[in-house]
């Protein structure tokens, strides 16, 4: 019996040694250009980035806020595999001999006030709400150029219209004005955020009403100057957009599209500094807006007795005027939302709090916030 067991053990060892190595399955990032194999994403959500730079002496990859030194092979290709990443979209850059560049293997995105590379770590079925589906009617994303008297310049708005817009020609629609964050632009929500898929899917499921969504660059696509106040109404960053929004953008949208123009049919939401802008615009203009969404909203230093003309002192007025006030953020970010909600609680201002579990100050948080917000707005 001992000899038999020994033979079996040797045979098993031989089979094990002959078996192929179980390499983690890898897939190309969906944002790769057609000819690029890398970046690759493995089953542990790690990204492998590779670039040919035979004359470089030092190459690094900066992914999701972390810097990774890259290793050179004999052919002059540099590569690195990141730590496991949160599912969803991530900006990244390459640093080649101290020059920050984009990866030619991916499409480019406007983030950090410059062009950036991007990769998408696949989510499971729980991410189907931001994916396109063949059995769902799809709306359109339009780019609309208009002249702003306030800024004395030509500007561009990105506008989503629901699938039924061009066939239901007698119907008018409520409008959501949706702002991006600091260092991004009006394309962010449709590219990084995939808002058109979220809208299509939520409308098709009956969880959201058909609506028009308007996105504009908001004058926060340039870096914010250090040393200036971040507090509400004190910071000059992005303030130039406020008269554009109120005096030019809204009238242009109401003239160009079949909109409902009453305050109950107009909402504004934004992510990060776009949330700061949304609060700055909506609270002093409750005669024009009835819905407000702050997605990781950068609302700092709120003084309910002073800011927004003191409107927050009258809790009954605000709670009546705002049909829905949404505040959402991720569990892994420190944007100051707890301090904001504490201030609002003390003032008696009602709001609905949403938490994105396991996510930080990133696009997956804001995709989730948008999905949650639109299932309540205009309803």
Identify what each model region corresponds to:
Residues 10-11, 32:
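General helical structural elements
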Residues 23-25:
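Boundary at the C-terminal end of the N-terminal hydrophobic targeting segment
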Residues 27-29, 35, 41-67, 72-379:
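Non-catalytic cap/lid and distal C-terminal segments of serine-dependent acyl enzymes
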Residues 14-15:
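Short, linear, compositionally biased motifs with a strong N-terminal bias
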Residues 2-10:
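Bacterial N-terminal signal peptides that target proteins for export
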Residues 18-20:
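N-terminal signal peptide c-region/cleavage motif recognized by signal peptidases
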């Amino acid at each position: 019996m001992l000899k038999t067991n020994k033979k079996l053990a040797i045979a098993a060892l031989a089979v094990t040694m002959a078996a192929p190595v179980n390499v983690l399955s890898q897939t190309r990032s969906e944002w790769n250009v057609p000819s690029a194999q890398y970046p690759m994403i493995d089953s542990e959500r790690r990204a492998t980035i590779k670039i040919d730079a035979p004359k470089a002496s030092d190459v690094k990859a900066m992914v999701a806020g972390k810097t990774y030194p890259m290793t050179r092979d004999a052919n002059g290709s540099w590569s690195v595999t990141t730590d496991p990443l949160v599912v969803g979209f991530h900006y990244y850059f390459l640093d080649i001999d101290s020059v920050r560049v984009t990866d030619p293997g991916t499409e480019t995105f406007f983030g950090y006030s410059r062009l950036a590379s991007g990769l998408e770590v696949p989510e499971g079925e729980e991410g189907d709400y931001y994916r396109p589906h063949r059995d769902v009617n799809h709306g359109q994303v339009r780019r609309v150029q208009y002249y702003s008297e306030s800024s004395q310049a030509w500007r561009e708005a990105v506008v989503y219209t629901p699938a039924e817009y061009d066939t239901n020609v007698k119907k008018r629609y409520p409008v959501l004005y949706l702002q991006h964050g600091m260092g991004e632009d009006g394309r962010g929500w449709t590219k990084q955020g995939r808002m058109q898929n979220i809208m299509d899917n939520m409308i098709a499921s009956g969880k959201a009403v058909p609506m028009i969504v308007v996105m504009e660059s908001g004058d926060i696509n340039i870096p914010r100057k250090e040393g200036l106040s971040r507090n509400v109404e004190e910071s000059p960053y992005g303030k130039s957009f406020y008269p554009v929004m109120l005096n030019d953008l809204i009238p242009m949208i109401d003239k160009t599209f079949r909109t409902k123009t009453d305050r109950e049919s107009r909402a504004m939401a934004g992510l990060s500094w776009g949330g700061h802008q949304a609060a700055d615009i909506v609270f002093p203009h409750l005669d024009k807006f009835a819905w407000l969404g702050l997605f990781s909203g950068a609302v700092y230093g709120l003084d309910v007795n002073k800011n927004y003309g003191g409107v927050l002192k009258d809790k009954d007025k605000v709670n009546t005027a705002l049909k829905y006030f949404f505040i959402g953020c991720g569990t892994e970010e420190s944007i100051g939302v707890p301090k904001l909600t504490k201030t609002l609680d003390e003032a008696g201002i009602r709001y609905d709090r949403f938490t994105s579990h396991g996510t930080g100050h990133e696009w997956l948080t804001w995709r989730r916030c948008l999905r949650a917000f639109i299932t309540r707005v205009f309803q």
